[in-house]
């Protein structure tokens, strides 16, 4: 059976600011108007993160815009959204977060077979010099690509 995947939004800043240790897939507990806003790609994951309350994980600071065609029964754009994951995955992440230097951030939000999914990652923060190295490598590879195009 093939999987239909429609990427709604990617958190490019997270890939730049952090070193990704491991990724997980989580479902999202959403309201109807939030799903419609996601289908319109009205979402922002820039400063969002995953937090734990008790033994449950929540997506925080993710902005899903209000659905414009919705009536009075609309959602709050930056509410905390519960993540739906297996217990063993939650325990794995929770144990890693107890160690110093680890965080958990969302990488992308997408629809998989019609259901909203969130790819989250266990990450470690990058130092400033690591970010500079990444920029230099990207610039060098861009220059090489452009020179190869010109030489054809």
Swiss-Prot record:
Matching InterPro entries: SmpB, SsrA-bd_prot, SsrA-bd_prot_CS
Gene Ontology cellular component list: cytosol
Biased composition (Basic and acidic residues): 132-142
Compartments where found: Cytoplasm
Location of region: Disordered: 132-152
Entry's Gene Ontology molecular function annotations: RNA binding
A biological process term (GO) from this entry: trans-translation
Keywords carried by this UniProt record: Cytoplasm, RNA-binding
Keyword presence, RNA-binding: yes
SUPFAM superfamilies: Small protein B (SmpB)
Keyword DNA repair (UniProt): no
Record CDD domains: SmpB
Alphabetical list of NCBIfam families matching this protein: PRK05422.1 (NF003843), smpB (TIGR00086)
Function: Required for rescue of stalled ribosomes mediated by trans-translation. Binds to transfer-messenger RNA (tmRNA), required for stable association of tmRNA with ribosomes. tmRNA and SmpB together mimic tRNA shape, replacing the anticodon stem-loop with SmpB. tmRNA is encoded by the ssrA gene; the 2 termini fold to resemble tRNA(Ala) and it encodes a 'tag peptide', a short internal open reading frame. During trans-translation Ala-aminoacylated tmRNA acts like a tRNA, entering the A-site of stalled ribosomes, displacing the stalled mRNA.
Family: Belongs to the SmpB family.
Protein name from the UniProt record: SsrA-binding protein
Species assigned in the record: Bdellovibrio bacteriovorus (strain ATCC 15356 / DSM 50701 / NCIMB 9529 / HD100)
